[in-house]
Amino acid sequence: GTYWQLLSNHKARLKALDQMGDKMIAMTRFSATDCLSQLVFEGVKTKSQVYNVQINDVQIRLRMLLNNEMDAVWLTEPLATAARLQGHRVMADSRDKKLSLGVVAFKKKAVADARRRKQLAAFTKAYNMACDSLNRNGLKHYSALLQKYYKIDKRTINALPKSKFQHVAKPQQENIDKAAAFAKTTIK
């Protein structure tokens, strides 16, 4: 499934989260990466403030890391692999927090409408079929699409870790609770 990694710039020579004081992290405010930043730095003592910089576009985040313009960035696959191949270090991984923040959300009004319910059922079926295809064939099978949309090379595609994509399912209560706690403390 989807996971996020906090990757530090190899030129910054950061080895531990407590060294991130006075450093900039590219992420998206009020999002999974913002929540993860809060969680990974809980209880971590840094000499000074860690600066969360809002860079919404993950392609731009990767380019900023590769161009030494950012100390650390939150990325998911396949861009995390591209960064690791360039020697950038994984400082944190959302899988370590046992947190899954990716959801497909629908408004109650949409679910109440019969025509919309039919569309949502078709969407869910197509999504689950895509997951099955990815799980059966692997990401490398879709290398042309990865190159086109993510602008990554064959080397990165060949280095991608094996991933398991999950069907649409109800979110786990633990994940809902963590997201709600984050929203309560962050969004005013």
Residues of each region from the PLM?
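Short, glycine-/small- and polar/acidic-enriched structural segments
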Residues: G1-K47, N52-I55, R61-M64, D71-E77, ...
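Proline/Glycine/Serine-rich low-complexity intrinsically disordered segments
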Residues: K11-D18, F41-E42, S48-V50, L62, ...
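Pocket-lining segment of extracytoplasmic ligand-binding domains
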Residues: N52-V53, D57-L146
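Short, solvent-exposed polar/charged micro-motifs at secondary-structure junctions
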Residues: L7, R61, G102-V103, H167-K170
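Secondary-structure end/capping motifs
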Residues: A112-I187
